[in-house]
Amino acid sequence: MHGLMLAGLLALPLSVLGHPTESHSSGISRRAIDITSYRLPQISKYTKSDAVPKQDGESFTTSSTGNDNSSSGDYVTTATNWLKKTLPKATYRLVKDHYIGDSGIGHVHFRQTAHGIDIDNTDFNVNIGRDGKVFSFGNSFYDGEIPKANPMVKRDFSDPVNALHGAIQILNLPVTAKPENVKAKPVEGKENFKFEGTSGALSDPKAQLVYLQKDGGLVLSWKVETDVGDNWLLTYVDANKNDKVHSVVDYVSAAEYQVYPWGINDPTEGNRTTLHLPWLKTLSTDWHIDGKGWYSTTRGNNAIAQENPTGGPEYENNYRPKSPLFIFKYPYSKAMTPPSSYRDASITQLFYTTNVYHDVLYILGFNEKAGNFQINNWNKGGVGGDYAILNSQDGSGVNNANFATPPDGQPGRMRMYTWNASIPERDGCFEAGIVIHEYTHGVSNRLTGGPENSRCLAALESGGMGEGWSDFFATAIRLKPGDTRVTDYTMGEWASNRPNGIRKYRYSTSLTTNPHMYVDADGLTSVHAIGNIWASMLYELLWNLIDKHGKGDVTKIRPVLKNGVPTDGRHLAMKIVLDGMALQPCLPNFVQARDAILDADKNLTQGSNKCEIWKAFAKRGLGVGAVFNLSKRTGSNELPAGC
């Protein structure tokens, strides 16, 4: 689950709340099941740009392919040939989510196969540079012996319905699947099914026969998909022993408008104002049209926002404010109670913040090809049909928020809760940092490993970076004109009613205020705690680039780019962090993500910010000599020569 924090923490004494270090998430954990014990192993390798072997022969220019992702005699062929050369004995398939990003890098993803069956946690991503040659690549392919027996010949595996029952029983899922009612209906693909006749899940469960790389070998498994709201799970059930689960992935991480405008993080920072046509006009449409019609409510191409007091799965027919004149102005004050009395204002604020963030990210490169959230992709690549479902005042929980990120083409889902640590209780929709944090989970999951692969942040350190990226973007966006590198920021301070926020340390460039170092991740099992470390490093990066390039006008929404490069340090930091997500391998660690950010800057600015980036990471122990080991990391403050 990619929630903002732990709902259970707010029940603890305030002295404990000041320094939360462990997660007590809702959902599965309420049923006494710890799904974190089923995490995928972290086995990816990343070959950064300056370590790629020299390439001879012809190349093509990625920019010459334009927006056409269907052309095959180009970067896809180059990537395929590189895989063949690197791993000549491997069998694999091309994932269909390849694209050329707006930074000129072609991103191509492959999945390893055995006997025509996916090895589900094996990925090979190749990044093709502007010169048409391999820029960098990541690899988690299995290099051991492939089972000689083809399971499709003897068909010595269990029925998918039995696997569904196994997942339900082992994880204690709130799904009913009576044997006499459940039918496994074949869908496109080998041994791929959708279950009909179940109840309790938000959509029909699914199952696909796959191999899983585990403990140095391959295990044949049923990948069972169940969306139960607070958890949207991929459960890898042994294909011969349905009482055994090998691994679990959770997709969930949580006109005219009167709103707190962009840059105002919460009601303590400013007042609500009326904004006229706030969308960024360089984009193709406004927020209330999707190519099929206009919606005089909080619905459009990028998002659909509504209240959800029951916490149920339905959303299309839920209440949302309507205005034939597109005037969304509704009363709200911090003293109003109960939250339902200002639901119109809450839904409008959530719709506004999410749409602005969508537009900013679009300019920075998170567009249709990269797997963004839109119903209509306007023939610009990617898969449409996937706006963000935004639930205001969701009744399925309190003191939290989460975001579910299925693969491209399926809607993301944000659940925003109320917070009861103050009187009156507070609505998380009015704290922009929470909304941005949650939406960023959708961004990092779509970019890492490619838009069609939403399990690439499922390892512990990868998931921690997911939380860190979310905190980083929320913090970078709330900067004020007078801020300097000595300015500190919290996360979730207003909603939680806690002056120090919901993280162990504030985001600060002071090692006294925030002493976090890379090796502090040793022994941590909470993704939020690990994320606090990663975001602390990115906060150093942010200020190093601002000190070099300036903040720009933080009162303006639109990033200013010149030749595709942001002109200010704030948006430049955001841009290279986004680009780094697309470059890094599936299931990355801190060292690999650092190298991908350096590579992103190398591609975007020819490495002109190399030293600023290295100094940010080295300051907090992720220097040249840093080494990842899950139980015992090696820290380093060393800088490369020339820095």
Curated annotation (Swiss-Prot):
Endpoints of the signal sequence: 1-18
Induction of expression: Expression is strongly increased during growth on protein-rich medium. Expressed at even higher levels when keratin is present in the protein-rich medium.
Chief place where the protein resides: secreted
One of the GO BP terms on file: proteolysis
Name of protein: Extracellular metalloproteinase 4
Species assigned in the record: Trichophyton rubrum
The EC number(s) this enzyme carries: 3.4.24.-
GO cellular component: extracellular region
Lineage, broadest ranks: Eukaryota, Fungi, Dikarya, Ascomycota, Pezizomycotina
UniProt xrefs under PANTHER family: EXTRACELLULAR METALLOPROTEINASE MEP (PTHR33478:SF1)
Gene assigned in the entry: MEP4
